[in-house]
Amino acid sequence: MKIQLPEHVKQIIHRLQQEGYDAYAVGGCVRDTLLGRSPQDWDITTSAKPQVVKSLFSHTIDTGIAHGTVTVMLDHTGYEVTTYRIDGEYEDARHPKTVTFTGNLVEDLKRRDFTINAMAYNDTAGLVDAFDGIGDLKRHVIRCVGIPHDRFGEDALRMLRAVRFAAQLGFSIEEKTRQAVADLADNLQKVSAERIQTEMVKLLTSAHPEEMRTVYELGLSRVFLPEFDRMMETPQITKHHCYSVGEHTIHAMQEVQQDRILRLTMLLHDVAKPVCVTTDEKGQNHFKGHPAEGAEMARVILRRLKFDNETIKRVCLLVRYHDDRPAVTPRNVRRAISRIGVENMEALFAVKRADTLAQSMYERQKKLSYIDAYEEIYREILKEHQCVQKKDLAINGRDLIAQGMKTGKEMGEVLQALYEQVLDEPQLNNKETLLALVLQLQQTKQGRSEEHTSELQSPLNLVCR
């Protein structure tokens, strides 16, 4: 079997072979190439020890030299080169206490997680596949190398990785491997939130986000996302729904594109339903207040999983407004854009459609038509360049200073009042009209009697008369 290696990978392997060492491309790059995919990076394994690797290449980085890994830099691209090794006993479900370098490739491949990741290749020896990884690729199976309980005991994150690979590749998890995950799921507590987040995002943004169901079934989500377990266990007895909250969530994730923000939003859009559910006298469920409560819960969850502030902000905003249904008028849509932000509206429409498509058929067309009408007005507003952000207001602080106004609280209040007025009446958004309103405000303020001073302190009252 012939694999086309990149030139830099060939160079590294050839240089090591010239010095009498074995070297192979290994792991995910071999797997992806055999699947007809383009590997994101190429890793190399070798019988040469780290110091030898460092001596053979002019630019190297000690990325994990204690565990035998050196990054070789060629034309500003890094290639991890790792010495064959045998791992000692694991004490923290992630790192071995000791590492022993070996000259035996198969011994090195034994320590790897799954058979599909335990294949090596070079142009001289061809494909080295000691654990039938190629067979598992053909069978579309995720299977541990050796004894699953041992592999997961070495690094508990491998359990979540098993489901992630199943999601990315559309594979199933082999039964003994699956059972070992269920047996050892609680060990995921030993893994950092950052590492869990990385695997979760890869799963969510894969072609099969429905594998979150497997995460739940195997007991993994109860460790890092117990809120999802409650969602899976909360029915929705209402004509608008045909699934539990969790199943609705899974179907909704499938209805949006493979985008990080959208998939996270759909995962969490109904996260508060289990805590907001009520049942009326007819036995029907209601979830009043779940968007606002859900936004707060989403914030807590995303912080717990160490997401960045921008992701938290966007996801929580979309969760907060996913079920917002203002009357579809230009005024209401302008105000919605102002609250939500132009940059978030396309995502909001995607979220609303996905939410609807994951519900029952009850009034589905009516709901979709509402979203279409909402979006149509939104696009018309953008086309006409109507003011929906304060920065689009036809005047600014410099213009007010030129009118004799001092900087400070009053200026901010006046600009806000003008902005509110323009949201209602977009035709007012030209410099002359707005300056005339400001002038009117100033004249009115000067001419009013003392007993009305308190009323006149509101710029909103003055501008909007």
Predicted regions and their residues:
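Catalytic cores of the polymerase beta-like nucleotidyltransferase superfamily
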Residues: M1-S449, S454
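Single conserved hydrophobic/aromatic residue that forms the stacking wall/gate
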Residues: E450-R465
